[in-house]
Curated annotation (Swiss-Prot):
Residues 187-196 have a biased composition (Basic residues). Residues 206-221 have a biased composition (Acidic residues). The keyword Protein biosynthesis does not apply. The keyword Oxidoreductase does not apply. GO terms for cellular component: nucleus. Its main location: nucleus. Residues 31-47 have a biased composition (Pro residues). It comes from Petunia hybrida (Petunia). GO terms for molecular function: DNA binding. It is found in: Nucleus. This is Protein ALF. Keywords: Activator, Developmental protein, DNA-binding, Nucleus, Transcription, Transcription regulation.
Amino acid sequence: MDPEAFSASLFKWDPRGAMPPPNRLLEAVAPPQPPPPPLPPPQPLPPAYSIRTRELGGLEEMFQAYGIRYYTAAKITELGFTVNTLLDMKDDELDDMMNSLSQIFRWELLVGERYGIKAAIRAERRRLEEEEGRRRHILSDGGTNVLDALSQEGLSEEPVQQQEREAAGSGGGGTAWEVVAPGGGRMRQRRRKKVVVGRERRGSSMEEDEDTEEGQEDNEDYNINNEGGGGISERQREHPFIVTEPGEVARGKKNGLDYLFHLYEQCRDFLIQVQNIAKERGEKCPTKVTNQVFRFAKKAGASYINKPKMRHYVHCYALHCLDEDASNALRRAFKERGENVGAWRQACYKPLVAIAARQGWDIDAIFNGHPRLSIWYVPTKLRQLCHSERSNAAAAASTSVSGGGVDHLPHF
């Protein structure tokens, strides 16, 4: 018997008996499993206005910040009202809508809800207007704004300084009707430089305050050529005016005086539209042609109506309204002599001062008493001329009285 075979069979190692069970082997080798992750915190419930947002047609976004209940907005939608419908409604129509809501659904509106609905509608209107204004501003900056046919027909790229040369070259130089005080030209040049520097510092996009409308008339003689850009850059402007007789159509690239007076009638129509819009919105209603009217005209496409030009010739329009026969006679006389529009404009002051002299020198009362002139501010230069002539007349009267009394004084 082979001893090696015996020992091998006796001490043969059984690997199946020596190996632990598979489960225990895995338990010993595999690392311990991490604990399961904690459950995420429960999401907060969305506000009531975010539920079924599409069913309210946008009312929830407009009413959410004004304390209006979701049920109230839902019932307004059930009545068939949308955001666009509410924005186009007047205040009395909104009151009727809220009364109908209370009567039909027997839903009592809170006092704050009644005011909140109107406040939300006004805020939405302002937001839409601001967006429209920004859009128009971007388009105008890009040069893509389209002028209407009337303004495009009479536009040119000639330098803005031409009208200033016309006024400087007008006839009758050196008279009191051209300048109120001596040295006025130098003062205007100094003021013009100050205005240019001041506007460069403030930026050309800053708009003038409407509360200083009447005070800003002082600069009408040089502000006519410096609109918007502070006199820094040339702007697209209308063809210059020429003196024409009543009913005469200007030839070539010119505009007649009948067209000029028609622009003032258009301004009156724009003022009426602005007043109607302000009444519908419950806002302050302007009574005179202010910056608000000029901005409205520009938005409506009538960019050929601008403040400097309309203020520059307002006294000419006043003479046309107060004494049309005298205005027509003046136009014919200057047309026959071949005078330019600057000379005609200066000559329009004298008949107005004569009219004021016959009515107690109260030029403001004359303007306010006329239906077509009451919407315009009295030009500062016209008021100064009336004051100057009144002072001269009073001085002459006092001199004549004192001179007549000297002869009767006793001689020592």
